[in-house]
């Protein structure tokens, strides 16, 4: 994994079209993520609870966590892995995820996190694309892990199963060697820390190259508006493999020495039990969880009075839902943020002390961020108004948290990153005189299902492998519980008796559950432009 430039050369010439964060710039330490999070650990910190395993209640202190991180770094270095290597991590939210993630980074290894719901086919794609030399997983996900590893020729000895499985090394076996953490040095501005996969504004999933500085910067930027405390208790149900869970929950909590209660999956009853039993104070959620808290009768039967902040992200969160949540959680600040994997991920947050900003907005630019709003039809800049709200336009952002680019995809990188360092988000926004942004539409084709990204192009390519499908197109259609669901428009080959259930089953066997096609409509032809581009607007208008 080669090193590359992390901070874009953003043109800071005075320009009325450039919108700046109203918050003064914050200092970003020029250190590795490990040093940023763990170097200042003092004796008092060492005894504080860092992690609680939600199902069992087992605890890990900050001292134990750092010792485990160092030991894991030594174990993987002893296997010949270090700077320039990529290791994949396929795991739900368990305490070991945190230790392994930071142990790998401590050794200078780049981590590519894989969705815990991924199929074997999807695991293989990411292993191959990222060039991963090893895979770390848990026994519950071993079938997908083994299928993916076998497909790319990865040896069983390179598939580490944290809790043990026949034929694979376990974490305990790796740590038995007692190897000290390696002495590695690298430039945090250029050394790649993580490779999460994102579809960006369009197309197939791509490796997002994020440096140590990107991740450090975004923790500091977010903390300016959403300060956590040493006394906060945070249920961690949003997956750590997703950039939101990785940066805002995991790294943000460690930075402030808060306690994380890990939950491997979302189950409303279990989530409510954890909030009540552990007196949770801050909830980071996606809109489907917020909806459950607002509407489900089970939430009314629990004591949730300890919650002081609820922050929603990963998908649109309207003002009506925010009001419903606030009604169920009196005294709780209900906030919203915005971001994307390519920004590590946070670019906007409603500051916790700005009660004047509507929770239906995504808030203000975080410190050290610049933005432009551009008319997508003309390319003309739309200025922030002196009063009222601007016309809608595409949001572009620049800052120290913006990715280097996409792994091995120069064209996609050029399409997404402007030469002056501004990133195309593909989202249509307005901005008001106070600097609050509201997302009003999406240029990009991605489907947002329960906060997960679903790329239509990926499902279309899969559908076209079916021998009885002549052509196909996929769009997202509104769904009150999940935000959007994938709908497939399918052209059958002549004489085919293919049914909607056949199509749904074909896709379901090969993708993660959130990518399943939920609606199928058979059509005579898929509408396309003269250049062959699918006319999704026509499909949405049907």
Label each region the model flagged.
Residues 1-60, 64-79, 83, 501, ...:
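N-lobe entry segment of adenylate-forming
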Residues 15, 58, 143-189, 199, ...:
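ANL superfamily adenylate-forming
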Residues 30, 47, 166, 179-197, ...:
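Conserved pre-ATP/AMP-binding loop-to-beta segment of ANL
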Residues 59-63, 193-217:
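Conserved AMP-binding A3 loop
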Residues 280-284, 296-357, 370:
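Gly/Ser/Thr-rich phosphate-binding loop
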């Amino acid at each position: 994994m080669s090193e590359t430039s992390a901070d874009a050369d953003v043109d800071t010439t005075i320009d009325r079209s450039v919108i700046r964060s109203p918050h003064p710039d914050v200092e970003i330490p020029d250190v590795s993520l490990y040093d940023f999070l763990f170097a200042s650990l003092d004796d008092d910190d060492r005894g504080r609870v860092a992690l609680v395993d939600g199902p069992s209640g087992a605890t890990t202190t900050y001292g134990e966590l750092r010792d485990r991180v160092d030991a894991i770094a030594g174990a993987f270095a002893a296997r010949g892995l270090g700077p320039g290597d990529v290791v994949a991590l396929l795991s739900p939210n368990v305490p070991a995820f945190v230790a392994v993630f930071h142990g790998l980074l401590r050794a200078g290894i780049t981590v590519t996190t894989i969705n815990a719901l991924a199929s074997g086919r999807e695991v293989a794609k990411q292993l191959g694309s990222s060039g991963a030399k090893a895979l770390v997983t848990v026994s519950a996900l071993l079938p997908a892990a083994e299928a993916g590893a076998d497909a790319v020729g990865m040896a069983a000895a390179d598939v580490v199963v944290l809790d043990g499985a026949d034929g694979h090394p376990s974490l305990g076996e790796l740590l038995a060697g007692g190897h000290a953490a390696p002495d590695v040095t690298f430039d945090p501005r250029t050394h790649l820390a993580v490779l999460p996969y994102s579809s960006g504004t369009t197309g197939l999933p791509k490796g997002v190259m994020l440096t140590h500085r990107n991740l450090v910067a975004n923790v500091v930027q977010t903390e300016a508006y959403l300060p956590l405390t040493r006394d906060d208790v945070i249920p961690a149900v949003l997956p750590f493999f997703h950039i939101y869970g990785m940066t805002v929950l995991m790294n943000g909590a460690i930075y402030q020495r808060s306690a994380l209660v890990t939950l491997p999956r979302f189950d409303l009853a279990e989530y409510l039990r954890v909030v009540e039993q552990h007196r949770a104070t801050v909830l980071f959620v996606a809109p489907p969880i917020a909806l459950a808290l607002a509407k489900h009768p089970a939430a009314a039967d629990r004591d949730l009075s300890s919650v002081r902040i609820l922050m929603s992200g990963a998908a649109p969160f309207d003002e009506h839902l925010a009001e419903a949540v606030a009604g169920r959680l009196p005294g709780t600040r209900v906030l919203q943020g915005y971001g994307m994997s390519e920004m590590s991920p946070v670019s906007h947050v409603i500051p916790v002390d700005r009660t004047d900003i509507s929770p239906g907005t995504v808030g203000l630019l975080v410190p050290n961020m610049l933005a432009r709003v551009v008319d997508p039809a003309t390319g003309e800049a739309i200025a922030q108004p002196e009063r009222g709200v601007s016309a809608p336009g595409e949001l572009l952002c620049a800052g120290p948290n913006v990715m280097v680019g996409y792994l091995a995809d120069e064209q996609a990188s050029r399409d997404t990153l402007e030469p002056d360092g501004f990133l195309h988000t593909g989202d249509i926004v307005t901005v008001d005189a106070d600097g609050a942004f509201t997302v009003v539409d999406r240029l990009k084709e991605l489907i947002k299902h329960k906060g997960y990204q679903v790329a239509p192009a990926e499902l279309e390519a899969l559908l076209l492998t079916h021998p009885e499908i002549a052509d196909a197109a996929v769009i997202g259609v509104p769904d009150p519980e999940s935000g959007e669901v994938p709908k497939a428009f399918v052209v059958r080959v002549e004489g085919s008796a293919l049914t909607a259930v056949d199509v749904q089953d074909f896709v379901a066997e090969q993708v993660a559950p959130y990518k399943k096609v939920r609606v199928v409509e058979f059509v005579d032809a898929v509408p396309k432009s003269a250049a062959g581009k699918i006319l999704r607007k026509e499909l949405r208008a049907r």
